[in-house]
């Protein structure tokens, strides 16, 4: 039995239907905003890194998305020069996953990320909640809670960071409308996973 074959009703999430989801593979053109409701979209884009130690590092980025509810990004690069300290070629990667529940926890999103890039590594997670005191009327509020961990810094490939590991938890709040845009943040290091100790309010 096929119900609503022309997709006339407001079923905002077709992923849980018995009919198998279709998909579309396309090049990630600049400014592209292709978000169909009845397809999983895969967008790809070639990538190229360069630094003095790794030389060129060709790769590819692949984005997987379903409307505004699910977004994943996979990014990989392979260095053509061997690392003299490891005697092998370095493999660099990035991963991002953003998920919004549809049938519960309205206006809430979950984000997970991780990367190993020339000079820096990081993993992290975040929960975001958007709300307003009067439904869909300003001022709007955005609350975020999250963490990130940077286990080490390779100072041979970047001079933007001091050596050492870093672990941080944070809370963020934003309130905005057409006339104001106010951001605040409370963050703190996490011992013993951080070589720095601090508490910060901005």
Go through each PLM region and give its residues.
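Outer-membrane beta-barrel initiation region
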Residues: 4-105, 124-139, 144, 155-178
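Membrane-embedded beta-strand positions of outer-membrane beta-barrel proteins
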Residues: 46, 74-78, 110-114, 142-151, ...
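Compositionally biased, intrinsically disordered low-complexity regions enriched
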Residues: 94, 115-117
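Extended beta-strand-rich architecture
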Residues: 111, 176-202
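Extracellular interaction modules
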Residues: 120
């Amino acid at each position: 039995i096929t119900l609503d074959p022309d997709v006339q009703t407001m079923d905002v999430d077709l992923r849980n239907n018995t009919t198998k989801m279709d998909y579309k593979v396309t090049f990630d053109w600049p400014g592209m905003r292709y978000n169909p409701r009845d397809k999983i979209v895969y967008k790809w884009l070639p990538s190229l890194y360069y630094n003095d130690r790794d030389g060129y590092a060709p790769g590819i980025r692949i984005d997987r998305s379903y409307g505004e509810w699910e977004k994943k990004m996979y990014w990989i690069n392979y260095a053509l020069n061997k690392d003299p300290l490891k005697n092998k070629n370095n493999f660099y990667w990035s991963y991002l996953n953003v998920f919004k529940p549809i049938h519960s926890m309205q206006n809430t999103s979950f984000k997970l990320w991780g990367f190993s890039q020339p000079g820096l590594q990081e993993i992290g997670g975040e929960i975001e909640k958007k709300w307003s005191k009067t439904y869909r009327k300003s001022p709007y509020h955005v609350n975020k809670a999250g963490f990130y961990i940077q286990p080490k810094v390779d100072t041979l490939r970047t001079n933007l960071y001091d050596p050492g590991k870093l672990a941080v938890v944070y809370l963020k709040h934003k309130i905005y409308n057409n006339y104001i845009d106010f951001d605040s943040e409370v963050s703190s290091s996490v011992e013993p996973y951080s070589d720095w100790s601090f508490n910060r309010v901005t």
